[in-house]
């Protein structure tokens, strides 16, 4: 059966556009509109068939008919685009209504944490020494025995080198340890920096201690080192007194007791005046200090006849205990946010 010829008259094209408009306007959802588009703008739609029929017209009629078909197609496409925009706007409005948030409802409070007091104290200590013109220095936590012991004048048979005191890093014979103090940072500073040197190092250290009220196997140390011409114990004492006042207020006082450390000579233990000591006010041990041992200076290529230096070190956990009256060091490592909150985010 022969196909019926396509009517390309103005009326036929106008009727086709009207049918398209009715179909698109009648679509109430985007899915309905997509189906209508396939039917009225697809390859078998009346307008598409009219475009295909242009080739069968005489050349004299083809140009005029082509213009009229293109106008009809443009009008049909415009009708689709307009309805598509309307349906999309309705969909988006419905989504906004469905997903709206009632701002009058009570909020769900999220728990708020706080920076750990050791972190806060470390920043305070750093600020104190930077204000005095010192520099911050850092070093690795996994150290060689050369920096952790040898360069600090520890003899080969010193008990601190044993596995009873120091965490050894496998494999055996690697001569690597978890640093037992931040003193290796001082050696690296003397080897890498120009003199004079005034540095403070703050970081984690590791020893094989049992966790109890006054000890922890992982703790934080602050150590200071000054190497310059003409430094004496008086400079050391003045520095530590200033440090004590910055942490403990005007009542912060120190005293020295003779002691022995391999890397300082003479050496002393530093006591801090503790008004709230159990049993009444008194002195409690705070840290160690002394003049840098000449052997340590020589190991770093520094002439001890020209330069002298002093060093000191103390634990941040112990300092926090004294400063804030914390009886049990275990509270600092158990991660309970209730311990950190009283110190405040900016304490």
Swiss-Prot record:
Disulfide bonds: none annotated. One of its GO terms (molecular function) is magnesium ion binding. It catalyses: tRNA(Phe) + L-phenylalanine + ATP = L-phenylalanyl-tRNA(Phe) + AMP + diphosphate + H(+). Mg(2+) binds at residue 265. InterPro entries: aa-tRNA-synth_II, aa-tRNA-synth_II/BPL/LPL, Phe-tRNA-synth_IIc_asu, Phe-tRNA_ligase_II_N, Phe_tRNA_ligase_alpha1_bac, Phenylalanyl-tRNA_Synthase, tRNA-bd_arm. It is found in: Cytoplasm. Binds 2 magnesium ions per tetramer. Pfam families: Phe_tRNA-synt_N (PF02912), tRNA-synt_2d (PF01409). Its cofactor is Mg(2+). Signal peptide: none annotated. Its EC number is 6.1.1.20. SUPFAM superfamilies: Class II aaRS and biotin synthetases, tRNA-binding arm. GO terms for cellular component: cytoplasm. One of its GO terms (biological process) is phenylalanyl-tRNA aminoacylation. Keywords: Aminoacyl-tRNA synthetase, ATP-binding, Cytoplasm, Ligase, Magnesium, Metal-binding, Nucleotide-binding, Protein biosynthesis. Belongs to the class-II aminoacyl-tRNA synthetase family. Phe-tRNA synthetase alpha subunit type 1 subfamily. NCBIfam families: pheS (TIGR00468). Tetramer of two alpha and two beta subunits. This is Phenylalanine--tRNA ligase alpha subunit. The gene is pheS.
